[in-house]
Amino acid sequence: MINRELIAPESIVIIGGSNNTQKPGGKIIRNLLEGKFPGKLYAVNPKETEVQGIPCFPDITSLPNTELAILAVPAAACPSIVEELASTRNTKAFIIISAGFGEETH
């Protein structure tokens, strides 16, 4: 089932957001800004306080509740990030932009 938070979120956080628009997290933010996303935008990046003009938080615990999270981080970090966002920030929808989820070989 597709929920409203995935297709029409009121707030989005980009985990791994960047000022560098050549990086996935930077491209995503640029596209959301250029597309004039009408809701609240946040980024999480421990090295920044602002990313492309939007508020940036050092970690998930500092972040306000957010409906949709876009993860642009290594695959190994994604499961714990999804769990933390769902349980502590009431995040209902996730988009994962990451490599490293390849199938296990035997």
Describe each model-derived feature in a short phrase.
Residues 1-106:
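Catalytic-core regions of core metabolic enzymes
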